[in-house]
From Swiss-Prot:
Keywords: Acetylation, Heme, Iron, Metal-binding, Oxygen transport, Phosphoprotein, Transport. This is Hemoglobin subunit alpha. Belongs to the globin family. GO terms for cellular component: blood microparticle; haptoglobin-hemoglobin complex; hemoglobin complex. It comes from Vicugna pacos. One of its GO terms (molecular function) is heme binding.
Length: 141
């Protein structure tokens, strides 16, 4: 459960992420593909090289989805319903991959905003990403 302080930290963080969400999403995907090569199996049709247009486009989707989620903290299931259906029924992504991408997103945000990435902000963003992951995997059952 996100506390009011968590929600404030998330809103502040996304205010600073702002127009960089697509770039950060792509960077996090690249980190994930490099650090956890098994995740590449879900993207056999992608050019996974650095700066790839396909990775950038998917990074934008990730960034847009997280921004939407941050704007709907009190109703993540509704905000992410279509995405949850897609990942559960069509793409069939192993739920562990959401944790891997979440880790890479945290590293990316910390790298770009080291002064703002306090332990409290880290904890709030981690809880937020865990909640997003839970919603995205809720329709697997």
């Amino acid at each position: 459960v996100l506390s009011s302080k968590d929600k404030a930290n998330i809103k502040t963080a996304f205010g600073k992420i702002g127009g960089h969400a697509a770039d950060y999403g792509a960077e996090a995907l690249e980190r994930m593909f490099l650090g956890f090569p098994t995740t590449k199996t879900y993207f056999p049709h992608f050019d996974l090289s650095h700066g790839s247009a396909q990775v950038k486009a998917h990074g934008k989707k990730v960034g847009d989805a997280l921004t939407k989620a941050a704007d709907h903290l009190d109703d993540l299931p509704s905000a992410l319903s279509a995405l949850s259906d897609l990942h559960a029924h069509k793409l069939r992504v192993d739920p562990v991959n959401f944790k891997l991408l979440s880790h890479c997103l945290l590293v990316t945000v910390a790298a770009h905003h080291p002064g703002d990435f306090t332990p409290a902000v880290h904890a709030s963003l981690d809880k937020f990403l865990a909640n997003v992951s839970t919603v995205l995997t809720s329709k697997y059952r």
